[in-house]
Amino acid sequence: MELTLSLLTIFLLFFALSGRCSDKNDFPEGFIFGSATSAYQWEGAFDEDGRKPSVWDTFLHTRNLSNGDITSDGYHKYKEDVKLMVETGLDAFRFSISWSRLIPNGRGPVNPKGLQFYKNFIQELVSHGIEPHVTLFHYDHPQYLEDEYGGWINRRIIQDFTAYANVCFREFGHHVKFWTTINEANIFTIGGYNDGITPPGRCSSPGRNCSSGNSSTEPYIVGHNLLLAHASASRLYKQKYKDMQGGSVGFSLFSLGFTPSTSSKDDDIAVQRAKDFYFGWMLEPFIFGDYPDEMKRTVGSRLPVFSKEESEQVKGSSDFIGIIHYLAASVTSIKIKPSISGNPDFYSDMGVSMTWTVLGNFSAFEYAVAPWAMESVLEYIKQSYGNPPIYILENGTPMKQDLQLQQKDTPRIEYLHAYIAAVLKSIRNGSDTRGYFIWSFMDLYELVKGYEFSFGLYSVNFSDPHRTRSPKLSAHWYSAFLKGNTTFLGSQGIMQMQSNFSSSASS
């Protein structure tokens, strides 16, 4: 599948511009551009070659929901996908390893077929000049550990996670130089243990359909264990592998660009509370060795306490911060007092109400183009946490899953070029941001809404047993940008590009 544009389109890409113009070469030397997937969302082959269920398999199967049993079938089509990455011009590709494929029971024997798959995939990437960025945990711990001792609510998982990380470092570290231990630690914790809408589906909040859990305590226990597991794996890498392999180990979190819903002082204060709970909860331990004072005051005894040794181990344990960013949120202060609330949870502790900045409704929507939100996040981290190295590990916008309509994904291009420009502006303002990954490289099983909408640069025909891939307009645009054939497009240029794409597709 050739990823080329007509001479007319290239001409338009150069000259149909508006506003400030930039191209890939404006970014600092060494800055990387890539795209991303995750194991459960891309691989499929859910019961092949020794893989056992993860919590995602159980969560979706027991609820009779759409699932990732086959999804994009990356397990069988990875060589084809690497060719597409090369044609697109990616510097790097971010993916995750399925813990239950590599070590099916979560600890103990390594699955040789799972090990060989990841070796083959990584070798395929490296041999084609694509830098692998690997995430160890993307919401999908083995169901065996959940059944045995409760998974992340039990500190026993720290030892098992460290042993799993050791296998990955040992087997793949000669090719992998960038490791992210935990994906979106804050959202994994909130979704799985406060709201119960993602695995393992634990909660106690009123109106939630959970059979077990405690939203007052478990989000904080799990968050604590995630931080300790990261610190343990990071320490292992530095002691055993760093000198030989020369890689780095980071941690990622979900971020929002917060803005007050009114000009009131209460809403201004609420924005800072939201930042403390969304950012500070995970970042302050890495920088200062402890949780934000606001969280300690509000959550009180329900918030775990770091021992002196744990504080020292967590502080400074993340070589970089991975940022997952999609949209902005309008924040309103609420008056709920956790001390008098009958059932406090993460949201009542935070004391804010948030309105997501989206276009359309939540069943089929696109995110609003709000690049200021990206700038706000990067500036806040720079100012508040010592300007650590940052990789934007996910950024993108969904569109309704429609094979014909989504090929001409003009709104996605408008979104991406605005956010890439925001990253460049932040770098020029001093942010130590070193890479940017579009979510997602192709259409996948999306973890909350399944196959209702898609983020991919490439479409996947999920009705076709061969899972045929096709480039969308955004794939052509990103490829041209990466190859230095284009600059950021103005709206007129994008619309003309769409028209030209339609003409070439029908000819």
Curated annotation (Swiss-Prot):
Glycosylation-annotated residues: N64, N209, N214, N361, N429, N461, N485, N500
Leader peptide range in chain numbering: 1-23
InterPro entries: Glyco_hydro_1, Glyco_hydro_1_N_CS, Glycoside_hydrolase_SF
Catalytic residue positions: E184 (proton donor), E394 (nucleophile)
GO biological process, one term: carbohydrate metabolic process
Binding site for a beta-D-glucoside: Q41, H138, N183, E184, Y326, E394, W439, F455
UniProt key word Hydrolase: yes
Molecular function GO terms recorded: beta-glucosidase activity
Keyword Disulfide bond attributed: yes
Catalytic activity: Hydrolysis of terminal, non-reducing beta-D-glucosyl residues with release of beta-D-glucose
Pfam families linked to this entry: Glyco_hydro_1 (PF00232)
Keywords of the record: Disulfide bond, Glycoprotein, Glycosidase, Hydrolase, Signal
Intrachain S-S bonds: C203-C210
Enzyme kind, highest EC tier: hydrolase
EC number(s) stated in the UniProt entry for this protein: 3.2.1.21
Family the UniProt entry places it in: Belongs to the glycosyl hydrolase 1 family.
Name of this protein: Beta-glucosidase 3
Organism listed in the record: Arabidopsis thaliana (Mouse-ear cress)
Taxonomy of the source species: Eukaryota, Viridiplantae, Streptophyta, Embryophyta, Tracheophyta
